[in-house]
Design a protein with these regions (language model features):
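Juxtamembrane/transmembrane-helix boundary motifs in multi-pass membrane proteins
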Residues: 6-10, 38-39, 73-74
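Long, amphipathic alpha-helical coiled-coil segments characteristic
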Residues: 17-37
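Internal transmembrane alpha-helix with an interfacial aromatic "cap," most often the third helix
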Residues: 27-34, 59-108
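Aromatic-anchored segments of alpha-helical transmembrane domains
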Residues: 54-55, 113-121
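Hydrophobic alpha-helical transmembrane segments of multi-pass membrane proteins
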Residues: 18-22, 44-66, 88
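Hydrophobic transmembrane alpha-helical segments in integral membrane proteins
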Residues: 2-24
């Protein structure tokens, strides 16, 4: 078997390792942020860290092992990656509104962010 016929175990190792580190850090900072204070702002940031970490985990799987997956599996993993990154950005927007409104969230803001997310998808 020649060198060109061998399949790599991980196809994009640096990108995958970076994504896996982001997953670990996202989980750590998510847990840490949730334990800080009992506020809506910190709750939203904690959720955002967890969601971004999970998106990074899926991105690392896709970048590292994606060529071994079927076309459908690749699309599903990448779609879920983008969904989790989008949810994370919406959480950050929501935390901004919570900060501006003295730790409270208006239903109108949630509806606007929901439709904004639908445009993203």
């Amino acid at each position: 078997m020649s060198m060109s016929e061998k399949a790599s175990v991980i196809y994009e190792p640096i990108t995958s390792i970076t994504d896996f580190l982001i997953f670990i850090l996202g989980c750590y900072y998510g847990w840490y942020t949730l334990s800080l204070l009992n506020s809506v702002f910190h709750l939203i940031w904690g959720i955002s860290f967890f969601v971004l970490g999970f998106g990074a985990l899926l991105g690392g799987v896709k970048h590292g092992f994606g060529p071994k997956f079927s076309k459908t599996q690749k699309k599903i993993i990448w779609f879920l990656t983008l969904i989790f990154v989008g949810i994370s950005s919406q959480c950050l927007f929501l935390s901004l509104f919570a900060l501006i409104n003295n730790n409270s969230i208006n239903l109108v803001v949630i509806i606007i962010l929901f439709f904004h997310f639908l445009l993203y998808v």
